[in-house]
UniProtKB/Swiss-Prot annotation:
InterPro entries associated with the record: Taxilin_fam
The species this protein was found in: Mus musculus
Protein name: Gamma-taxilin
Region annotated Disordered, chain positions: 1-37, 64-86, 106-130, 501-524
Sequence positions bearing Phosphotyrosine: 283
Coiled coil: 153-465
Residues with Omega-N-methylarginine modification: 12, 24
Family assignment from sequence similarity: Belongs to the taxilin family.
Induction per the UniProt record: By LPS.
Basic and acidic residues compositional bias, start-end: 1-10, 106-115
Function: May be involved in intracellular vesicle traffic. Inhibits ATF4-mediated transcription, possibly by dimerizing with ATF4 to form inactive dimers that cannot bind DNA. May be involved in regulating bone mass density through an ATF4-dependent pathway. May be involved in cell cycle progression.
Major localization listed first in the record, in broad terms: nucleus
Gene symbol of the encoding locus: Txlng
Protein localization: Nucleus membrane; Cytoplasm, Cytosol
């Protein structure tokens, strides 16, 4: 039977594998990994549904085959259990399929990825075909396994085992579902956190972009100003060159006109040449200065760009440091709270100790004031007092040793007292029992006395007759003897109990020995 059940479970596993392969074949065309994970989960869920349908069909077939008149009650009972199990499995299957559908929708909606696999109708038809195939195979395997069994009880036992296995599998699936739901909640929280961080990064990026735009505008304004200055300088240079050419033309005209004054004007020409050289040198120096200014501006722009990159990197590093410092500060805050609570408790304890020490210090101050008064009044007797103090210290040491010994003795006495209290309680219980016995004996004695009085009255009535004088004396004597024997036995019993109680109470304390004697006297 075990081998048949193993074959059935293997066939069931094969059916689930085929269903999973069919599901994978339906989604294998799509390139992303999300669809492959979805097909795996869908194949698992299809396998669970196939298992549940297989169990329901097998239980229904078994109930229809073995519904004999002799075991009608048992079959009804098992059929009800099978219906409940099938309802439970179908509910779990619907739950799993609904959760899977919601997860698949959540995975597919944000990405908006194009599906290359077959449509949903074809997938449903393929799943239904796979289910029918696996159901047919598992039903055939179950029927073969159940036909091998001889009695219906064995078949029911096999079905019960199979039902228990399916219940365990469904519970495991529920546990996995709970774990997956928790993971999904964690992932959603992480997603929200990442979205918030992303929004913060976007805001920082927008701020940096605005700063960069402002810097670019500033650079553009600087470039325009530099260009305007260069244009103005070029215009000035052109005006100077034009003016210089005009002056040269005038000089040439004057030279042509004043050939006579060449000798006189040579010196002036030399001076003018020197001035021109100076002007040319100044112009060259100005051009070099302008080139240097342009180069300096370009270097400044490069430096600004490098500084921007450095600032972006520094901002990123500052954000990371800020996060680290925040985590570190949170940890320090929790630790400081714990330390604060501990310090509060220590403060309360120290305040209590301070109050005690203050009381002791006040007592000490009072004693010191008294000792100061005594010191002022008895300075002459200080030497004697020192000797007495030494003696008293020795005596205090002796008294301390005695006190310690007395404490030990007190502890021993307390232990003995607890033992004696227990014994006293036991004796009280025994005394209560003795009192109950005495009361019972007294009631019996009273009853016997009443009976004796009744018998005496009867004997006196009979003695009134003359014929029965001699036999009447005999029962009276018998009654008197019976009375005396009963009294003697009661007295002996009570004396023995009283002696035992007195002996035990004599070993106890006088307080505990007084109460049992009073109880005995009250009983007497």
């Amino acid at each position: 039977m075990a081998t048949r059940l193993e074959e059935v479970t293997r066939g069931r596993g094969g059916g689930t594998e085929e269903a999973s392969e069919g599901g994978r074949g339906g989604r294998r065309r799509s390139p992303p990994q999300k669809f492959e994970i979805g097909t795996m989960e869908e194949a698992r869920i299809c396998g669970l549904g196939v298992k549940a349908d297989m169990v329901c069909n097998s239980q229904a077939n078994d109930i229809l085959q073995h519904q004999d008149p002799s075991c009608g009650g048992t079959t009804k009972k098992h059929s009800l259990e099978g219906d409940e199990g099938s309802d439970f499995i179908t509910k779990n299957r619907n739950l799993v399929s609904s959760v899977f559908c919601t997860q698949e929708k959540r995975e597919e909606i944000p990405g908006r990825e194009a599906r290359t696999g077959p449509p949903d109708g074809q997938q449903d038809s393929e799943c239904s075909r796979n289910k029918e195939k696996t159901l047919g195979k598992e039903v055939l395997l179950l029927m073969q396994a159940l036909n091998t069994l001889s009695t219906p009880e064995e078949k029911l036992a096999a079905l019960c085992k199979k039902y228990a296995d399916l219940l365990e599998e469904s519970r495991n699936v529920q546990k996995q579902m709970k774990i997956l739901q928790k993971k999904q909640a964690q992932i959603v929280k992480e997603k929200v956190h990442l979205q918030s961080e992303h929004s913060k990064a976007i805001l920082a990026r927008s701020k940096l972009e605005s700063l960069c735009r402002e810097l670019q505008r500033h650079n553009k304004t600087l470039k325009e100003e530099n260009m305007q200055q260069a244009r103005e300088e070029e215009e000035r240079r052109k005006e100077a060159t034009a003016h210089f050419q005009i002056t040269l033309n005038e000089i040439q005209a004057q030279l042509e006109q004043h050939d006579i004054h060449n000798a006189k004007l040579r010196q002036e020409n030399i001076e003018l040449g020197e001035k021109l050289k100076k002007l040319i040198e100044q112009y060259a120096l100005r051009e070099e200065h302008i080139d240097k200014v342009f180069k300096h501006k370009e270097l400044q722009q490069q430096l600004v760009d490098a500084k921007l990159q450095q600032t972006t990197q520094l901002i990123k590093e500052a954000d990371e440091k800020h996060q680290r410092e925040r985590e570190f500060l949170l940890k320090e805050a929790t630790e400081s709270r714990h330390k604060y609570e501990q310090m509060k408790q220590q403060e309360v304890q120290l305040k209590q100790q301070l109050s005690l020490y203050m009381d002791k210090f006040e007592e000490f101050q009072t004693t010191m004031a008294k000792s100061n008064e005594l010191f002022t009044t008895f300075r002459q007797e200080m030497e004697k007092m020192t000797k007495k103090i030494k003696k008293l210290e020795k005596e205090t040491i002796i008294w301390r040793t005695k006190w310690e010994n007395n404490n030990k003795a007190l502890l021993q006495m307390a232990e003995e007292k607890t033992v004696r209290d227990k014994e006293y309680k036991a004796f009280q219980i025994k005394l209560e029992r003795l009192e109950k016995l005495c009361r019972a004996l007294q009631t019996e004695r009273n009853e016997l006395n009443e009976k004796v009085e009744v018998l005496k009255e009867q004997v006196s009535i009979k003695a009134a007759d003359g014929d029965l004088v001699s036999p009447a004396t005999q029962p009276c004597a018998v009654l008197d003897s019976f009375k005396e024997t009963s009294r003697r036995t009661l007295g002996m019993h009570l004396e023995a109990r009283a002696k035992s109680v007195c002996e035990k109470s004599a070993a106890q304390k006088p307080s505990s020995s007084g109460s049992p004697a009073q109880g005995i006297e009250s009983v007497d």
